[in-house]
Amino acid sequence: MKSFTDLQEGLYDPNIFKAFFLAGGPGSGKSYVVKKSTGGTGLKIVNSDDVFEKYLKQAKLDFKMDANQGKQRDVLRTKAKKVTAKRKDNYLEGRLGLVIDGTGKDFNKISSQAAGLRQLGYDTHMIFVNTTLEVALQRNKERDRTVPEKIAIDSWKQVQSNVGKLQSLFGPKNFIIVDNDMPDTDGKLFDHVFKKVQGLLRKKVDNFIAKAWMAKELRLKQR
């Protein structure tokens, strides 16, 4: 039987009750940023795009959004979202640490999601990946799965218009901006971001809801 200390260390793992929202438009380099800034932390990534792209490859469909394949893609996208939602529910059941990938263009959706997580006892944070429009459009062209330029431009503008509101929602201390225009050749940028993420992960969750859940789990494990 595990000791009280062993049980307590598991429940007080720094990644439990931590949620990082990821924001940035198409071509911002979010996937690369999240890999560099949260890799090795054990945070669970919630991203339906990864699942969707896997399904596209399996079905041998074009990543360039061929209009003739629209119906097939829609079916796979719906399936990917359902699978991702199920995974997220499983993560939430164990109150595991999360990275919720998104663009940041729908402020109300993010606000609602953050509120729901806080009601479960989560500390919520945001990593905002920022680029100029020119860089975003160029990177979008270079991606395997591109989006039409007009959609990329509209998305970039919507995301930029939400920066202030998002910073207010999460608070300055929980809002990390990554200026990702230039290649991080010396590694200093991502080292700085990684340290910020680590600092937030090390901070113990100190709200009543999380403490009550952990106390309950501890009692169950001691039976």
Predicted regions span which residues?
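The conserved Walker
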Residues: G25-P26
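Acidic, metal-coordinating catalytic cores used for nucleic-acid/nucleotide bond scission
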Residues: D101-I110
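Proteolytic processing junctions in secreted/extracellular precursors
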Residues: K2-G10
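Conserved phosphate-donor/acceptor-positioning beta-strand/loop module used by diverse small-molecule
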Residues: K105, R118-R139
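Conserved substrate/cofactor phosphate-moiety recognition/catalytic segment
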Residues: S31-L96, N108
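Phosphate-binding P-loop
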Residues: G10-F17, N90-E93
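Short hydrophobic/aromatic beta-strand immediately N-terminal to the Walker A/P-loop
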Residues: A19-F21
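Conserved GTP-binding G-domain of TRAFAC-class P-loop NTPases and closely related GTPase folds
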Residues: L133-R223
